[in-house]
């Protein structure tokens, strides 16, 4: 499963997932630009929010998060949404993942689409490993990345 805005790089990656036989569900409205109709079979053509989004994230076997290439030093909001929902996420590798995750980021990230496809297929065949990883990450995110934590962090920055 994935959701969000499509752009050329992301569209090519999603097409590669489908071409490799991965069952993909794509949420969000069809954009006027950068859309490839080969994604039609995966596209749910539905914008998701709130409880529905949380339910779909948690119910997905794997949430695929390929971040915008401009996010070289950071992660996107989806990274926090997915990990905070308890879902299993596979995302683009970023060096900052070492600081954000309680596990080796290599376990839940990819540096190429081929590596991403390989890891998706691996984790689909190893659900218990997927559950253990997502549970560990979820607990870490609840302990460290809630809005309460963010507010305290901002207040500390402001009043230094």
Please place each PLM-identified region on the residue numbering.
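Nucleotide-sugar donor-binding catalytic core of glycosyltransferases
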Residues: 1-80, 84-103
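Short, charged, surface-exposed secondary-structure boundary motifs
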Residues: 35-37, 118-121
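Short acidic active-site motifs
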Residues: 51-52, 115-119
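Short, flexible helix/strand-to-coil boundary loops that buttress conserved ligand/catalytic motifs
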Residues: 101, 120, 134
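Conserved acidic donor-binding segment of nucleotide-sugar-dependent glycosyltransferases
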Residues: 107-113, 123-127
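A charged, aromatic-enriched C-terminal amphipathic alpha-helix characteristic of glycosyltransferases
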Residues: 124-158
């Amino acid at each position: 499963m994935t959701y969000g805005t499509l752009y050329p790089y992301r569209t090519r990656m999603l097409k590669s997932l489908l071409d490799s036989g991965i069952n993909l569900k794509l949420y969000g409205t069809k954009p006027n630009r950068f859309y490839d109709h080969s994604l039609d079979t995966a596209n749910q053509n539905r914008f998701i929010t709130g409880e529905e989004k949380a339910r779909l994230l948690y119910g997905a076997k794997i949430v695929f998060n390929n971040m915008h290439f401009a996010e070289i030093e950071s992660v996107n909001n989806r990274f926090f949404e997915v990990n905070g929902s308890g879902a299993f996420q596979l995302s683009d590798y970023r060096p900052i993942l070492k600081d954000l995750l309680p596990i080796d980021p290599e376990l839940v990230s990819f540096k190429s689409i081929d590596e991403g496809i390989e890891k998706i297929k691996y984790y689909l065949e190893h659900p218990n490993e997927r559950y253990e990883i997502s549970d560990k990450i979820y607990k870490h995110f609840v302990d460290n990345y809630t809005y309460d934590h963010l507010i305290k962090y901002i207040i500390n920055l402001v009043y230094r």
